[in-house]
Amino acid sequence: MMEGLKKRTRKAFGIRKKEKDTDSTGSPDRDGIQPSPHEPPYNSKAECAREGGKKVSKKSNGAPNGFYAEIDWERYNSPELDEEGYSIRPEEPGSTKGKHFYSSSESEEEEESHKKFNIKIKPLQSKDILKNAATVDELKASIGNIALSPSPVRKSPRRSPGAIKRNLSSEEVARPRRSTPTPELISKKPPDDTTALAPLFGPPLESAFDEQKTEVLLDQPEIWGSGQPINPSMESPKLTRPFPTGTPPPLPPKNVPATPPRTGSPLTIGPGNDQSATEVKIEKLPSINDLDSIFGPVLSPKSVAVNAEEKWVHFSDTSPEHVTPELTPREKVVSPPATPDNPADSPAPGPLGPPGPTGPPGPPGPPRNVLSPLNLEEVQKKVAEQTFIKDDYLETISSPKDFGLGQRATPPPPPPPTYRTVVSSPGPGSGPGPGTTSGASSPARPATPLVPCRSTTPPPPPPRPPSRPKLPPGKPGVGDVSRPFSPPIHSSSPPPIAPLARAESTSSISSTNSLSAATTPTVENEQPSLVWFDRGKFYLTFEGSSRGPSPLTMGAQDTLPVAAAFTETVNAYFKGADPSKCIVKITGEMVLSFPAGITRHFANNPSPAALTFRVINFSRLEHVLPNPQLLCCDNTQNDANTKEFWVNMPNLMTHLKKVSEQKPQATYYNVDMLKYQVSAQGIQSTPLNLAVNWRCEPSSTDLRIDYKYNTDAMTTAVALNNVQFLVPIDGGVTKLQAVLPPAVWNAEQQRILWKIPDISQKSENGGVGSLLARFQLSEGPSKPSPLVVQFTSEGSTLSGCDIELVGAGYRFSLIKKRFAAGKYLADN
């Protein structure tokens, strides 16, 4: 084949140039050119060489630039051919030779011009064909990215007028062709398979939310009373109480999806959600005064004291029963459910479906698994008996049903929602236990290897459980994407209140399926599956992380890395367009996360330095509830804007030790430190102001939703992500008209869903907009139903609180801040 690629030395018709070719390849490097009969003679050889450099732009007929004489077109079009199919060079008139001033050497070359090259082309052998076919992949791999020169044979800037395509018929060969370089077809590597890229980017957000549903918010400890309500859009199994207890609530909070699924999951809302939506429509809006009933879940069976005890991890048999009396059981808003140990286990925020709670009053969808106490009391008792069993509890559940329903619902009660076992210890590994939602290292998902800290004798990493296949960090494991325990997309359990937790699997920062997302403190109340430790840094699991089981190793003199996360949930109820009727309640929690290797460090250093930290902007908080087992504070401090706390190190060490024994595969341990409410200033404290207007007629219904991004509610203006507006429409909708912007209509559940990727000051009109829709009805008129809104935000809090360490021995490797919509409703 290589010989077949060689270039012939054929000369374009009418050209007198002789290209000396020493290798029979017709190299165009020669400078000597003989002028055509009509070409003006060159005054010098140098001029000839210069002119030769210009030959690159010869005319299409092969004549050089400056050729003005008549062209023998007939001869050009039908040249004489020899027996081999080559065109016969015309004889040059003697007068031509006398006009040039070339040296004798040129004349000799002229004589050689009539020489012919005998080129043989070897046909491709069958064996070669097979060989080539067999090495196609190898060639692609080896030269796929090599850009070949467009004209490998040519070395001179001048093009060879006689270059002719090989393999042409004799007639075609006779026709000179311009040797313009043809861009070579460079073999390119086939595009990476989308499946291969999946691990890099993670599964679709919606799938992640499905898994996140497992994160269903835990009922907020009664400590808070109305504490953090579940996102209205999410139907949380934990929320057993009807939406508002007072005036007919728009919907049962459980029905309301706890968190807007970050992925903007499909409208499909768990049947439970539909039910909740139905209830919402049926029930009258709660009165403004009935704030608690609106936001506080009604956990009927539990007493506030019991919840408080469960909320806190107790190292002693006795647990403080004196949870702040301020919080009433009803206030006990479902705190984010302790996410199951496995990221997938934790309910991912369901598709907006969770918001579906507002869905029309159709028959309730599948029973809210979350709602069912699932023997929540029993679970709570177990939790009280073993503070840390909570973590294991989820893991023990083997059937998705058990976990999805019972566990999801159970987690909230067992660990008083406020505190998932004070330490949602091994976030990933932890079971439904409140803090365990961290999803640090669920068996299904690979644990993120902790970066070993300097240590003379780093402990060997714990063995990887067979159930946890080792995956590259950032690559979601199969288990992460579809955990057997994760609630079905339609599961009634509310997705974690805050879909904040992105699945950790994809990339450490934006993975969608990881348990971390599930474990992530759904902003609601679920303890953020705070962080995972990797390469010397902590990453909030909700952001997604690849977990590795390697323990943290460090020397006795090294500062211990600690991560902190503030997760807040904003609950709001908007009535019409009257700002004075807006009811707002903001709850939050502060969690500290420790690398798993810290237990080994404490074992080698039984008297570690006391961990002391200071909360800044403390004056903006109210009803602050420190973990009674782990935190101490000085109430005599004069500065109202800051509050200093120190950790009871013996209790912390004992707790972490127990957790490490129960969850040896965990890579980090989350410990709930503070629960609090934020002083709210009405509608001014809501990051997204809403107003809904209905016009219901027998044959049609017009719906208008106005929203406005409010930067004043945040200490740092950050975008609201994955904003979803869900409204159930009854009256037998037969046709959807004039929907602006485009929305998704779920005919089965009779709900309309708008999804907006983000709303911020950079959005059109500065974050101010409207949603419009007209519905044709067959059984109208419709009855106005509550609008459920979900969103998440990272990088800021509504309280403006911050934290800093006091003293030596520790350092913050990460401080995470985020907030999300809890029960965010608007009515006509």
Swiss-Prot record:
Q: Name one GO molecular function term.
A: microtubule binding
Q: Name one GO cellular component term.
A: presynapse
Organism domain of life: Eukaryota
Region described as Interaction with DPF motifs-containing proteins: spans on this chain = 561-567, 593-595, 667-670, 813-818
Compositionally biased intervals (Pro residues): 245-260, 346-367, 457-475
Does the entry feature the keyword Transmembrane helix, yes or no?
A: no
Q: Which GO terms describe its biological process?
A: clathrin-dependent endocytosis; energy homeostasis; positive regulation of feeding behavior; positive regulation of receptor-mediated endocytosis; response to dietary excess; synaptic vesicle endocytosis
Record-linked PANTHER family: F-BAR DOMAIN ONLY PROTEIN 2, PROLINE-SERINE-THREONINE PHOSPHATASE INTERACTING PROTEIN 1
- Name-wise, this protein is SH3-containing GRB2-like protein 3-interacting protein 1
| Gene field | SGIP1
